[in-house]
């Protein structure tokens, strides 16, 4: 039987560029080379697609070690060196279309997780892992995700949407409006970034102004959200029409909240899988994860994040990630492993789900 070619997309224009590379390295190590030919496809920070030689060199670079070396800027420097050396290479889009059987998308954040690439691949009839265009776009936007979840009966924290234009036009009025509506502390988040990029916990008006400046500089709108006193619980979901939910996992942050630095540089957070939850709460969280997954029209995979409120055990949606991390410290593969699906099997299932999804859409 001839091997199928898997195009592994990684890198990208988002702030999660390095994390995408780390995820791709983990995925590449688990792809069954007896069944698949791997064709790495690196997208640099400027959005340029690189030919296989440069892409393989980037994939071979241990970005995680560079990030944790104490000089994270060395990761960016190394990537710049590789792409500069490959400046004369020309990506052959025609060959890509002809030879690719299925795409594994390991891009996180904007221009990879938000539906843009999914729409491009749909146009050319290339099946791909994870959610389709619409679900990807909805899930990428934390505000739209909350509205869909509320419509499906899932609790969310009190929130308010601030457009970057409105804030820049009248920052003082925006801050006054927020302070009237919310108690301290609260969270400010870019509406469409992942890996906790740009998130701030604020305790006063001065910190609020700085947090809004930061979030609005990263995205076209910001989400202001009441702080929830509770445990951070996550669930991995896998499947198309009949998805399954994993054992829940718990993150115990090493700081005020599970920040980008906590996740990928300091690595101080404690992870507990399965989460030690009161009787009935674990099943409620799993059911809520499936409800959100279906409400958004997700396919393939997603990680759904919740709070379990202290004192009440109320299950409150935080967010959903349609292309969760696949690093060695990422919750999604670890929760699946705790549910009986190892990393290699998980990668294989995601590729098969992508092909299954394509076979269904081709009948329409």
Curated annotation (Swiss-Prot):
Coiled-coil boundaries: none
Catalytic activity reported: 2 D-alanine + ATP = D-alanyl-D-alanine + ADP + phosphate + H(+)
Domain of life, source organism: Bacteria
Keyword Nucleotide-binding among UniProt keywords: yes
Principal localisation: cytoplasm
Annotated positions binding Mg(2+) 2: 319, 321
Co-factor binding comment: Binds 2 magnesium or manganese ions per subunit.
Protein residues bound to ATP: 179-234
Binding site for Mg(2+) 1: 305, 319
Class in the EC hierarchy, top level: ligase
A Pfam family hit: Dala_Dala_lig_C
Reported cofactor(s): Mg(2+); Mn(2+)
UniProt record, GO biological process: cell wall organization; peptidoglycan biosynthetic process; regulation of cell shape
Keyword set includes Manganese: yes
Domain ATP-grasp: 146-352
Localization (cell): Cytoplasm
UniProt cross-references to InterPro entries, sorted A to Z: ATP-grasp, ATP_grasp_subdomain_1, D-Ala_lig_Van_CS, D_ala_D_ala, Dala_Dala_lig_C, Dala_Dala_lig_N, PreATP-grasp_dom_sf
Name recorded for this polypeptide: D-alanine--D-alanine ligase
Organism (species): Chlorobaculum tepidum (strain ATCC 49652 / DSM 12025 / NBRC 103806 / TLS)
UniProt lineage: Bacteria, Pseudomonadati, Chlorobiota, Chlorobiia, Chlorobiales
Originating gene: ddl
């Amino acid at each position: 039987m001839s091997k199928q070619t898997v195009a592994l997309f990684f890198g990208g224009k988002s702030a999660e560029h390095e994390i995408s590379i780390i995820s791709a390295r983990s995925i590449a190590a688990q792809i069954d080379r007896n069944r698949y030919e791997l064709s790495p496809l690196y997208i640099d920070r400027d959005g340029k697609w690189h030919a296989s030689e440069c892409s393989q060199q980037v994939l071979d670079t241990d970005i995680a070690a560079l990030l944790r070396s104490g000089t994270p800027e060395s990761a960016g420097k190394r990537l710049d060196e590789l792409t500069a050396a490959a400046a004369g290479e020309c990506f052959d889009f025609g060959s890509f279309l002809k030879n690719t059987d299925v795409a594994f998308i390991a891009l996180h954040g904007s221009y990879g997780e938000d539906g843009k690439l999914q729409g491009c691949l749909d146009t050319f009839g290339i099946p791909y892992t994870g959610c389709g265009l619409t679900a990807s776009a909805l899930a990428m936007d934390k505000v739209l995700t909350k509205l869909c979840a509320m419509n499906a009966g899932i609790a969310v924290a009190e929130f308010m949407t601030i457009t970057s234009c409105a804030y820049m036009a009248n920052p003082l009025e925006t801050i006054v409006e927020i302070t009237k509506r919310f108690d301290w502390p609260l969270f400010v988040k870019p509406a469409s970034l992942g890996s906790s990029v740009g998130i701030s916990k604020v305790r006063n008006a001065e910190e609020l102004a700085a947090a809004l400046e930061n979030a609005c500089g990263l995205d076209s709108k910001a989400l202001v959200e009441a702080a929830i006193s509770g445990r951070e619980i996550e669930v991995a979901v896998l499947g198309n029409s009949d998805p399954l939910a994993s054992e829940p996992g718990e993150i115990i942050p090493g700081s005020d909240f599970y920040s980008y630095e906590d996740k990928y540089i300091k690595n101080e957070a404690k992870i507990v899988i399965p989460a030690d939850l009161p009787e009935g709460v674990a099943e409620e969280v799993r059911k809520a994860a499936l409800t959100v997954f279906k409400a958004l029209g997700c396919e393939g995979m997603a990680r759904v994040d919740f709070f379990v409120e202290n004192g009440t055990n109320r299950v409150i949606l935080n967010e959903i990630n349609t292309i969760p991390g696949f690093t060695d410290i990422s919750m999604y593969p670890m929760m699946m492993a705790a549910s009986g699906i190892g990393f290699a099997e998980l990668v294989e299932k995601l590729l098969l789900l992508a092909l299954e999804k394509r076979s269904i859409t081709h009948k329409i």
